[in-house]
Amino acid sequence: MSQVLITGATGLVGGHLLRMLINEPKVNAIAAPTRRPLGDMPGVFNPHDPQLSDALAQVTDPIDIVFCCLGTTRREAGSKEAFIHADYTLVVDTALTGRRLGAQHMLVVSAMGANAHSPFFYNRVKGEMEEALIAQNWPKLTIARPSMLLGDRSKQRMNETLFAPLFRLLPGNWKSIDARDVARVMLAESMRPEHEGVTILSSSELRKRAE
């Protein structure tokens, strides 16, 4: 049985993943700190605070597995600094909290094109986040790099609305992927006992494993 920490549970991938975790018999405890209350989620410890770091600090029980599904855009965040806080600082804080509480496996949603040396700000921050997690020397670290995510968001992103039809037609890693499939693969990966070290799942690999 596993005790799980998940951040980003109000997001597209995280929302699907939280519902899957609630119904997963191998999971017996879920901590899901959020900025706003989740509502009626039986069996879920949901500390909430507008400052996610304060909600995260309320998680003190032992943890086995950490899922981080945090992610925004520079437009949504409002500034470069706010984007870095959401997609780098809070992700690293989630990981550090999990390690402190005994977790052995970290699974994180990154993005296709993540590269700490990228000339593109978004990809660079995602790459720097990945490098920060790798530097923590997790026994198991799984990094998911999906392409454009498909699914119903509470607030639609304009670029995704415009380009979603195109990304459905693209080949390989560029082809869009259903957020539910990303969540399904992450859950399956968390239950695999045999792999250790760093596993990076490209968008095409995520689609393949979801089939």
Curated annotation (Swiss-Prot):
It comes from the Bacteria. InterPro entries: NAD(P)-bd_dom, NAD(P)-bd_dom_sf, Semialdehyde_DH_NAD-bd. SMART domains: Semialdhyde_dh. GO terms for molecular function: NAD binding; oxidoreductase activity, acting on the aldehyde or oxo group of donors, NAD or NADP as acceptor. Pfam families: NAD_binding_10 (PF13460). To yeast YER004W. This is Putative NAD(P)-binding protein YraR. It comes from Escherichia coli (strain K12). The gene is yraR.
